[in-house]
């Protein structure tokens, strides 16, 4: 089966087809300070400048060996285009939402007709095109973005999101519907620009914040709508110990489910989802990849591979201060497993 390219291998793995070896990449954020310095493309400029955005994204493929190019580096691009106020962060801190446009009601809340021309969306789409031109057709590009649940909480504020989920469910559902619509439009624009996989991170959907009952009753249908509406392979990442919702996540229609080490072993995760979706992860970003040492990274990777992980990856966004050699160790672990 040596006819695989990086792209066909990743897509086959996510679709549950046989592959010669498990791909190793990151479906979550990949910008690390060491690479910013090496290639001269640093945050926060790389969040707005398409050339720098592309350069930094390509660096983690070229210099660490991750088998996909993933961009951008935050979960605020769509929120900003929908009216959220953003703090653009620093060289080692990601952008974050600082103010929500609709904390009291949804008067005037719609998906703007010019959504794809707003704020940083054109820069992301341009960066994807630059990446494709530079890496050629055989390297997969992963477009990352906030999921509809997290977007909804950004639009109305986390406080209102929690409150409305119990007391004003009509408004809660309206916020989710607007967010799903905007998310599908942005995702498909990334696909059109050249992304092969769309990976959404939806931390607000985690049982840490929303009950499994709320997930089942309100959130699952919007995630299903998203995966059905996007014209590519999709991956759903939800942070935290998601065991209580993992089976429901597997019914959301995403090819891949990206999980942290908090779920337990890959084998335990696979047991829950069966063949309904593929498991991506679950090497700890904060507790293993960031601090190392290398033998711990390799040992964790081996456990994941032996447990049947479908795509070996960091369990969450790579911490900006993670050393390059630690990311390389993740790739080496996969190579050694098949040696």
Swiss-Prot record:
Effect of residue 239 to A: Strongly impaired methyltransferase activity
InterPro entries: Methanogen_methyltrans, Mtase_MtaA_CmuA, UROD/MetE-like_sf, Uroporphyrinogen_deCOase
EC number: 2.1.1.246
Source superkingdom: Archaea
Keywords: Metal-binding, Methanogenesis, Methyltransferase, Transferase, Zinc
CDD domains with a match to the protein in the record: Mta_CmuA_like
Cofactor info, note text: Zn(2+) is involved in coenzyme M activation: in the absence of coenzyme M, zinc is coordinated by a single sulfur ligand and three oxygen or nitrogen ligands. In the presence of coenzyme M, one oxygen/nitrogen-ligand is replaced by sulfur, probably due to ligation of the thiol group of coenzyme M.
Cofactor(s) in the UniProt record: Zn(2+)
Binding site for Zn(2+): 237, 239, 316
A biological process term (GO) from this entry: one-carbon metabolic process
Group of enzyme by EC: transferase
Catalytic function, reaction form: methyl-Co(III)-[methanol-specific corrinoid protein] + coenzyme M = Co(I)-[methanol-specific corrinoid protein] + methyl-coenzyme M + H(+)
An example molecular function term from Gene Ontology annotations: [methyl-Co(III) methanol-specific corrinoid protein]:coenzyme M methyltransferase
Stated family: Belongs to the uroporphyrinogen decarboxylase family. MtbA/mtaA subfamily.
PANTHER family the UniProt entry points to: METHYLCOBAMIDE:COM METHYLTRANSFERASE MTBA (PTHR47099:SF1)
Described purpose of this protein according to its UniProt entry: Methyltransferase involved in methanogenesis in the methanol pathway. Catalyzes the transfer of the methyl group from the methylated corrinoid protein MtaC to coenzyme M, forming the substrate for coenzyme-B sulfoethylthiotransferase. MtaC can be substituted by free cob(I)alamin in vitro.
Protein name (Swiss-Prot/TrEMBL): Methylcobamide:CoM methyltransferase MtaA
Organism encoding this protein: Methanosarcina barkeri (strain Fusaro / DSM 804)
